[in-house]
Each structure stands twice: as structure tokens, then as C-alpha cells.
Amino acid sequence: MAQHTVYFPDAFLTQMREAMPSTLSFDDFLAACQRPLRRSIRVNTLKISVADFLQLTASYGWTLTPIPWCEEGFWIERDDEDALPLGSTAEHLSGLFYIQEASSMLPVAALFADGNAPQRVMDVAAAPGSKTTQIAARMNNEGAILANEFSASRVKVLHANISRCGIRNVALTHFDGRVFGAALPEMFDAILLDAPCSGEGVVRKDPDALKNWSPESNQEIAATQRELIDSAFHALCPGGTLVYSTCTLNQEENEAVCRWLKETYPDAVEFLPLGDLFPGANKALTEEGFLHVFPQIYDCEGFFVARLRKTQAIPALPAPKYKVGNFPFSPVKDREAGQIRQAAAGVGLNWDENLRLWQRDKELWLFPVGIEALIGKVRFSRLGIKLAETHNKGYRWQHEAVIALASPDNMNAFELTPQEAEEWYRGRDVYPQAAPVADDVLVTFQHQPIGLAKRIGSRLKNSYPRELVRDGKLFTGNA
């Protein structure tokens, strides 16, 4: 694999020499940093099993190497890498996999280790969505996830990825993560804090990542991280699990932040060792039981992961002074909800008791029941999935609901050919050789729902959202 030139400040190299265990070679570290990062994907098991995915892609010339800490994760090498971006493959467009760096699969693996099965989870710094979607898959779309993102521009990307992956148990918020300890005390069974950091571990992906690096900036970032982990710890239920992670390598932003929390709450913080998380985890294990992943150990990004348990309650923070404002939605009455459910089932949309119908004007939404306890305590950017808009003739079903709720085995499902599916993703109407009978048609490809179409004569009217329409080459040559 080709080398690329990484910029290393001298002070950074000195810091790494001091931080690196004697069992590791500094020369190996430098060599690993100069190699481009291996690409990796995670199969979205909400849509397809790993076995079925491997069978589906077997003829594509993809070499998939299992990632030890994630059963759904694979390093990928492709024959058609230059001809077709991985994000333009049919399997990516329909949400069958997520392009995710291997190291970033570690925090969620730690969150669910040892049979941990949380019902209400917070992802404090969630965009672009790799870990939120991984959490949702581990929860099998049940329970509830609060996915927060401080950057306004990244909230839209977060929602797009959640929607593409067919996730329905998520509420989105847009706050500084330091507010949650006061706003939502002891509300979560598990919390992932993948903290903003100096990014020292990402030089294989971005050779200039350290251009603005300095020891002083590390100290400033670590101060923010301490405030974030303190807030997250307050939002965690007693007995709950907190995973703290970064994509950086210095100890000040990693081990020292976790030690600070334990020193602050000595009777409430327990470090849960990660040496048994996967075969070979001991190669990255610190004396506290954290994983400090230098890039040469597993040939991936540099990363840090710690798992903590809150063993008892801690004194509450002062209640926030802000007002949330009126919640603009109201629950749909049972009788009307039954009619809506029946109409939705007619086009192949079904949901379980984990979701409840709410209404705002002519909009119908499905909210995860597990998030209802947070209503009135925090303002949401987006909650659950938009099911439909009502109009005189019935319902206008929404694309995100089709992706999240539709069964490809519905009687009105219509499987497109590769050529027809390509037209669909380009936003064009489809003219199948044998038109379906139903007026409302659930459009599928590779036995996966990709949209809802109106049949007009022999034409299927395209309803694919304009912002998702693709140009250029689509699909593998074998699709």
C-alpha cells in the first residue's frame, strides 16, 4: 500500500515516545502512521444478516476481512474501487452497510459487552452517525436513543444516515453536551461519550491532522472533556454504563480524564476492564483496563476506549434555568390510531408497541415510547420518524417511514431490475415491462424497500427525495 507523508510536530513525537508502552516499537508506530488507512464497513443487521450480505456481495470481487471486535465489521478491498465509489453501491444506498472506520466500532462493542442490554441510551456527540446506527442495530431498533450533536451543520448529516439505515428509535438534539447532567439527571442506562479531541489518531486518513497541534491545545481540549464526562456521568442512572472514547493518543485527553472522574467521585466510579472484549484486546490494555489503541497494533486508526460503571447516585446539579417551551405534538387517540395503522399496513408499513403515534397539524409521527419521559425536559431537533401527511384523499406516506417500516414481502411490493433501480435512484420515473396492479407500490431492489411509487398507467411515478438523488455511475457491474 502506498505511503503518504504525515506532518509530525517534534513535541508530539516526544509525547508519543513517553506515552507508548515498552512492548511497542516507536518505529512501527511511525511506519503505521505513514500507511493509508484500510477501508472498513459495518453490515447493518437491521436490514440484512451478515451471512446474507456476504452471499449477496460474493460475486463483486470484494475481499472482506473480519474485524475482531465487531461481528458485523469488515475491512474491505475492492477490484472496482476506482470505477465506483463505495457510497454509490446499491447496498450502501439501501442502507445495508455503513462505511465506518474499524477503530470507531470499538466503543459500541464496549457499551454492549458482557451482555449489557440498555433500554435508553445517549450518544453525546453523535454525528455523522456511525456509532448511533451501530447502537440502534445492537438494540434491534427497540428501546430509545438520544443522539445529540453540537454542530448544527452536522445534525442534518446525522439524520440522513439514521434514515438511510432504517432506524426508528432515535431522538435528535442539538446542544452542548455539558447541559445534559443538569437537564436529564439519571435518565440513561448507558451513555457513549465519543468526545471531541485533538485527533492524533486520524493521521492515516488526514496527513495534515496535526498541523494545528500543540500541547496547550491538548490541555484546553482535556478541560472540555472533563466537563463533558462530568455532565454525562450525572445523566447516567446508578448501575449504568458509560463508555468514554476518543480518536487521539495522548494520555491527558484519555486516561487522565477517566482518572479525574474517579478522583472526583471515588465511591461512584468503577472501571470495567476491557481485556476480554475480543481476542487480542490485551495488546492494547492499560493497567486500568482501558484500551489505548496505537495504530500499529491492529493496523487501524489510533483510538482510546474506557468503560465505567456508576455504582451509586451522586449529588444532583442545579436545575437548568431555561424554558423548553410547549411541545407541539399531541398523542393520536386510539380509534384514529387504529385507522392509521390499518391504512399504513395496506402499503406495507407496520410497527410494534415500541412506537406511538403523535400528530402535529397534518403531520403524523411515530415516537419511541422510551423517549416520552424526556418530553418537556429538553428540546428536540427531530424525534422518531415522520410517518405521513394527511390530505383530503388519505395519507401521503413519507420516504423515511418506508425505509424504516416497510416489509419487502408485502403483497404490493414490486422488485426492480438493476437498470430500473438505477433510474429510481436518479430520481426518474420507472417504466417496468410488466406494470404492477396496485396503485400504491412498494418499490424494492435486492429484496430491500427503496421507496413508494404511484402507478400511473404503465409508469411508476418516482417519489425518491430530491436531496437523495444520485448522478454518475451507480451499482457494481454485477448488480
Swiss-Prot record:
GO biological process: rRNA base methylation
Domain of life of the organism encoding this protein: Bacteria
CDD domains for the chain: AdoMet_MTases (cd02440)
Assigned EC number: 2.1.1.178
Pfam families tied to this protein: Methyltr_RsmB-F, Methyltr_RsmF_N, Methyltranf_PUA, YebU_pre-PUA_dom
Keyword Transferase: yes
Predominant location: cytoplasm
Molecular function in Gene Ontology: RNA binding; rRNA (cytosine-C5-)-methyltransferase activity
GO cellular component: cytoplasm
Active site: 247
Broad class of enzyme this protein falls into: transferase
Substrates-to-products reaction catalysed: cytidine(1407) in 16S rRNA + S-adenosyl-L-methionine = 5-methylcytidine(1407) in 16S rRNA + S-adenosyl-L-homocysteine + H(+)
InterPro entries: Methyltr_RsmF_N (IPR031341), MeTrfase_RsmB-F_NOP2_cat (IPR049560), MeTrfase_RsmB-F_NOP2_dom (IPR001678), Nol1_Nop2_Fmu_2 (IPR027391), Nop2p (IPR011023), RCMT (IPR023267), rRNA_ssu_MeTfrase_F (IPR023545), RsmB/NOL1/NOP2-like_CS (IPR018314)
Positions with a binding annotation for S-adenosyl-L-methionine: 125-131, 149, 176, 194
Function (record text): Specifically methylates the cytosine at position 1407 (m5C1407) of 16S rRNA.
Family from the record: Belongs to the class I-like SAM-binding methyltransferase superfamily. RsmB/NOP family.
Protein name: Ribosomal RNA small subunit methyltransferase F
Source species: Escherichia coli O17:K52:H18 (strain UMN026 / ExPEC)
